[in-house]
UniProtKB/Swiss-Prot annotation:
Gene3D superfamilies: 3.40.50.880. This is Phosphoribosylformylglycinamidine synthase subunit PurQ. The gene is purQ. It is found in: Cytoplasm. Its EC number is 6.3.5.3, 3.5.1.2. Part of the FGAM synthase complex composed of 1 PurL, 1 PurQ and 2 PurS subunits. Pfam families: GATase_5.
Length: 224
């Protein structure tokens, strides 16, 4: 038995192929989910990948949030299905109300494309259980609107509830409190700006650190 991981594609998505490859590399069966799909085809987990869904018109993730497939993703997440949003996918999850806060223009207003070091701040999620506490990960970051912001009250709640999942070592985009990724209250929904699906082989690298997220999802699905 293995997990069936759905990978969503919107018009303008760029990283669905990479996310699918990462899921296959850990032994999952990949199911392609189109933005117009009205069901999730029996998947056990969902990845909402990066790119520029619908051209990022209005604002990043604002239109994708209303795609039919997202109604199903939200409903499945409410039932406890593991969901991972990467970069634009993180923006979509925030727009959909699955995660609090928002992603805004980077400090300096420049698109950032570089490898960054992250610290795993929580291993109590469906997507980080395979990591050691405070593990360091080297993964690519590529975004123009990657600065995480939220009201102070929300930030305090995230900190107090252990829902900050990843932090930047070198905060290149100005995210409040160095936050690179957060999770839902039950730890089943995770969003992060850097790209673990681009860090699955040391040869094409920068590392294979990103595989830990996908192995963690397998554990979450297979062990419940």
């Amino acid at each position: 038995m293995t997990a069936r991981i759905g990978v969503v594609t919107f018009p303008g998505t760029l990283d669905d192929v990479d996310a699918a490859r990462a899921a296959r590399q850990v032994g999952a069966e990949v199911v392609s989910l189109w933005h117009a799909d009205a069901d999730l085809k029996g998947v056990d987990a969902v990845v909402v990948p990066g790119g520029f869904s619908y051209g990022d018109y209005l604002r990043a993730g604002a239109i994708a949030r209303f795609a039919p497939v997202m109604d199903e993703v939200v409903a499945a997440a409410d039932r406890g299905m593991p969901v991972l949003g990467i970069c634009n996918g993180f923006q979509v999850l925030c727009e959909a109300g699955l995660l609090p806060g928002a992603l805004t223009r980077n400090v300096g207003l420049h698109f950032i494309c570089r490898d960054v070091w992250l610290r795993v701040a929580s291993t109590s999620t469906a997507w980080t259980s395979r990591f050691e506490p405070d593990a360091d990960l080297l993964v690519p970051l590529k975004s123009g609107e990657g600065r995480y912001v939220a009201p102070e009250k929300v930030l305090d709640e995230l900190e107090g509830e252990g829902r900050v999942v990843f932090r930047y070592h070198d905060n290149v985009n100005g995210s409040l409190r160095d936050i690179a990724g957060i999770c839902s209250a039950n730890g089943r929904v995770v969003g992060l700006m850097p790209h673990p699906e681009h860090a699955i082989e040391a040869l094409t690298g920068p590392s294979d650190d990103g595989l830990g997220l996908f192995y963690s999802a397998l554990d979450a699905v297979l062990t419940g």
